[in-house]
């Protein structure tokens, strides 16, 4: 088939699935939920039902995913949009800005929308979720969902995950809970959740703070809320931002190479997050490498944040690091500390203001 024919076939297939999804909607009295599809394993196809590791992600469009779970129409009037189509390792900061703006526009244009679901690959799902937790300006729920097995696999987890995500987005109890991840019948908060296993279905965990709730056969149940600022209480506005400040992560290990710090500064990084050992401890090699950075004028030197590579626990303020200007990341993982620092730098370079932001978010 010629390339033009392939494109026409893809368009026709998308239209057919969209029509099928619309035809299944039994009532306009159901909550309206938007599904924004971005690709990932949940939309992947393998060569056989046992192909659990070798498959092509993003092979199914969002309309096809929704049409494949007709039970969805019992719970919501679903509108589907394919906003991007990439594997989550290839998601970009521009994609994040596009998704955040689209969600904010959906909420602003239609007060009847109950919530938004985003289908997403699991590799970077927690990062996208936390970015949206800081940039969606509405109390209505945003739920990210993925799968550990492709759609063609035996016992694929994607269909039930998608159904449960839509049920959560449609639930009145989900308002004000911030951005969430729903997988394996469990509801997690974007700030605390992380992927903990490469293949197991129960991969998403908030190891110390626990689930927000569960999605069971009878109802969506919540047992706690995140008290940190998010969504409708967030100060971050990306409506007119064209690019996010450059921030990178330096991973600490025995005799780590200090040249990495120098290279990031030379490349123009506006911030550096340390995935430090233990309770956010830098080695003497790293401290030495930071001396030229600390000698730079405050207006031009990168903002420095201490997080921990351990995966659990707080990184707290210490006099020696405070004197060096390193800001503690509290319980944020290195990758989430990077996201918060990028957004903080869109507003200020004042160290005290950035400390406040890391305390409140």
Question: Over which residues does each language-model region extend?
Answer:
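ATP/NTP phosphate-donor binding region
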Residues: 24-106, 288, 312
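Short, acidic/small-residue loops that bind anionic groups at enzyme active sites
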Residues: 129-160, 166-170, 296-308
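Internal gly/pro-rich beta-alpha loop/helix module
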Residues: 144-217
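C-terminal non-catalytic interaction/assembly regions of soluble proteins
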Residues: 279-361
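Accessory alpha-helical/coil subdomains and C-terminal extensions
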Residues: 30, 36-37, 61-72, 189-271, ...
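Bacterial N-terminal signal peptides that target proteins for export
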Residues: 1-8
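Short Gly/Thr/Asp-enriched flexible loops that form oxyanion-binding sites at enzyme active sites
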Residues: 118-140, 284-292
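Boundary at the C-terminal end of the N-terminal hydrophobic targeting segment
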Residues: 18-23
């Amino acid at each position: 088939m010629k390339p033009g024919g392939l494109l026409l076939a893809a368009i026709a297939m998308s239209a057919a699935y969209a029509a099928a999804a619309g035809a299944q909607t039994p009532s306009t009295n159901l909550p309206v939920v938007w599904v924004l599809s971005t690709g990932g394993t949940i939309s992947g196809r393998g060569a056989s039902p046992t192909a659990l590791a070798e498959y092509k992600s993003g092979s199914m469009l969002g309309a096809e995913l929704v049409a494949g779970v007709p039970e969805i129409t019992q719970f919501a009037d679903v509108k589907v949009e394919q906003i991007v189509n990439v594997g989550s390792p290839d998601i970009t900061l521009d994609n994040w800005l596009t998704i955040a703006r689209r969600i904010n526009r959906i909420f602003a244009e239609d007060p009847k929308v109950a919530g938004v679901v985003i289908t997403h690959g699991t590799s970077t799902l927690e990062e996208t979720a936390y970015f949206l937790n800081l940039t969606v300006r509405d109390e209505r729920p945003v739920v990210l969902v993925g799968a550990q097995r492709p759609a063609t696999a035996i016992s694929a987890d994607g269909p039930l995950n998608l159904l449960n995500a839509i049920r959560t987005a449609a639930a009145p109890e989900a308002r004000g809970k911030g951005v969430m991840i729903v997988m394996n019948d469990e509801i997690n908060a974007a700030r605390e959740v992380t992927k903990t296993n490469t293949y197991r279905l129960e991969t998403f965990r908030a190891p110390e703070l626990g689930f927000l709730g569960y999605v069971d056969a009878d109802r969506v149940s919540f047992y706690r809320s995140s008290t940190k600022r998010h969504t409708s209480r967030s100060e971050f506005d990306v409506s007119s931002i064209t690019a996010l400040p450059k921030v990178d992560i330096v991973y600490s290990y025995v005799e780590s190479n200090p040249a990495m710090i120098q290279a990031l500064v030379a490349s123009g990084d506006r911030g550096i997050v340390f995935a430090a050992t233990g309770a956010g401890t830098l080695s003497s090699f790293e401290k030495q490498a930071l001396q030229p950075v600390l000698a730079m004028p405050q207006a031009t030197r990168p903002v420095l944040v201490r997080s921990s590579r351990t995966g659990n626990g707080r990184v707290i303020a210490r006099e020696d690091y405070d004197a060096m200007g390193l800001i503690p990341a509290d319980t944020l993982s290195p990758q989430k500390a990077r996201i918060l620092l990028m957004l903080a730098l869109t507003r200020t370079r004042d160290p005290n203001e950035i400390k406040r932001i890391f305390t409140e978010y």
